[in-house]
Amino acid sequence: MAEEQAYHVSKGLECIKALRENPPNMEEIQEVSNIRDQTYKSSKESGTTGVQEEEITQNIDESHTPTKRSNSVSDVLQEDQRGREDNTAPVEAKDRIEEDTQTGPAVRRYYVYDHCGEKVKGIEDADSLMVPAGPPSNRGFEGREGSLDDSIEDSSEDYSEGNASSNWGYTFGLNPDRAADVSMLMEEELTALLGTGHNAGGQKRDGRTLQFPNSPEGSIGNQACEPIKKGHRREVSLTWNDDRCWIDKWCNPICTQVNWGVIRAKCICGECPPVCDDCKDDPEMQNRIWYETPTRETK
């Protein structure tokens, strides 16, 4: 390939050099283009071979021998026609590949061709394997054609009803051949995991069942016999192993002692008193040493 490319490059440079030394006029360019179009159309209709096309181009060259620039243009025409002949080989190789890949609806075949369009023998890679279009099985595929029917029959027996392998979850010993098989197995595994989580409603860890907690509004509505005291807020802890912990807390009033750097909790219910019952009548509450100003703490 490198020698052929170097040959074409050298020829192209020679043609460019010749055209720079003796540039053709518009009449000669138009005449040569008309002759090329006529020869191409006639060869396409009559099906002439490459040898006849070369004879036609030689006749054109002989008719334009008086000038050196005409020879350079004829060289360009010859290289163009050779390029057309060289381009036919990849097209034929592509047609052969398409014919080989359409052998059956359930089998995909891949072959390797060289630049001449001939099949290369002795190359065995992942693309040369026969891959069925059905679901993955527990057995790896082989490159032999006779093993395809056996693998299909064995897979139908393995995935029969009542067998543990019929579950599409992850099983040890599974040997997928391609990345597509691995992604399919991962999707099936995730689907099975999500299905079991929704059906069971809970998961067991170390012998204990994790229950998802209900919404606090619904839980409080069910506890109608225990109303919330005024000035309190109610919190519910995480439900673990059917044990529920209800916590009653005061919203921090301004008379509660806090340490420096502690952020006072804000009242979210709007009903908590600003001070406790013990301090509401204390005239010295404003002089507590752990506050700078009570108004600043309530912001």
Curated annotation (Swiss-Prot):
Region (Disordered): 30-101, 128-163
Binding site for Zn(2+) 1: H232, C251, C276, C279
Amino acid composition bias (Acidic residues), ranges on this chain: 148-160
Transmembrane segments: none
Residues the entry annotates as binding Zn(2+) 2: C255, C267, C269, C272
Keywords: Host-virus interaction, Inhibition of host innate immune response by virus, Inhibition of host interferon signaling pathway by virus, Inhibition of host MDA5 by virus, Inhibition of host RLR pathway by virus, Inhibition of host STAT1 by virus, Inhibition of host STAT2 by virus, Interferon antiviral system evasion, Metal-binding, Viral immunoevasion, Zinc
GO annotation, biological process: symbiont-mediated suppression of host cytoplasmic pattern recognition receptor signaling pathway via inhibition of MDA-5 activity; symbiont-mediated suppression of host JAK-STAT cascade via inhibition of STAT1 activity; symbiont-mediated suppression of host JAK-STAT cascade via inhibition of STAT2 activity; symbiont-mediated suppression of host type I interferon-mediated signaling pathway
Gene3D superfamilies: 4.10.80.340
Coiled coil: none
Biased composition (Basic and acidic residues): 79-99
GO MF annotation: an example: metal ion binding
Summary of the function given for this chain in its UniProt record: Blocks host interferon signaling.
The protein, known as: Non-structural protein V
Originating organism: Phocine distemper virus
